[in-house]
């Protein structure tokens, strides 16, 4: 199977690459349209700011390429947020617009931001991405912005208030947490995605 990690220039790819390799795959990192469009599975990881990430997406001519993908795509952390419409970060950043939902800064409710560490995730029953993962399993988060619960939410988490922990629209999936840092539950989620 052809597994590709999109080379956005805004992610630490080694941990994602290693996590995929542990399942027996050899992922390629690429932004070449011929490689990306022929991939069986695509990963869109991201760390840092939405502005820097979108600058890289545009500079590397990935904007239209990502939106043209028809195979399963998994956005991780900031990569999930990039699927949204607009981030409140940096006075507003236009995102890919695949999911018609904004990404506001989380309300702190007296809790520290960023939301960092292990938290429980509650998936919708029957979603293939979470098959075999128990309701309330712990995943590892590091973020200050989060997509609200919306019609494309497939899993929720609570940090002062509920937010979207995972999302799906058509072939595009996103997880706000880091599956590559989330132990057995994260490994199972990656396996589910790779075997879809």
From Swiss-Prot:
One of its GO terms (biological process) is L-histidine biosynthetic process. Heterodimer of HisH and HisF. InterPro entries: Class_I_gatase-like, GATASE, Imidazole-glycPsynth_HisH. The gene is hisH. GO terms for molecular function: glutaminase activity; imidazoleglycerol-phosphate synthase activity; lyase activity. The lineage of its organism: Bacteria, Pseudomonadati, Pseudomonadota, Gammaproteobacteria, Enterobacterales. IGPS catalyzes the conversion of PRFAR and glutamine to IGP, AICAR and glutamate. The HisH subunit catalyzes the hydrolysis of glutamine to glutamate and ammonia as part of the synthesis of IGP and AICAR. The resulting ammonia molecule is channeled to the active site of HisF. The keyword Cytoplasm applies. Its EC number is 4.3.2.10, 3.5.1.2. It holds the Pfam family GATase. Residues 2-196 form the Glutamine amidotransferase type-1 domain. Gene3D superfamilies: 3.40.50.880. It comes from the Bacteria. One of its GO terms (cellular component) is cytoplasm. Its main location: cytoplasm. This is Imidazole glycerol phosphate synthase subunit HisH. Keywords: Amino-acid biosynthesis, Cytoplasm, Glutamine amidotransferase, Histidine biosynthesis, Hydrolase, Lyase. It is found in: Cytoplasm. It catalyses: 5-[(5-phospho-1-deoxy-D-ribulos-1-ylimino)methylamino]-1-(5-phospho-beta-D-ribosyl)imidazole-4-carboxamide + L-glutamine = D-erythro-1-(imidazol-4-yl)glycerol 3-phosphate + 5-amino-1-(5-phospho-beta-D-ribosyl)imidazole-4-carboxamide + L-glutamate + H(+); L-glutamine + H2O = L-glutamate + NH4(+). Pathway: Amino-acid biosynthesis; L-histidine biosynthesis; L-histidine from 5-phospho-alpha-D-ribose 1-diphosphate: step 5/9. The active site is at residues 77, 178, 180.
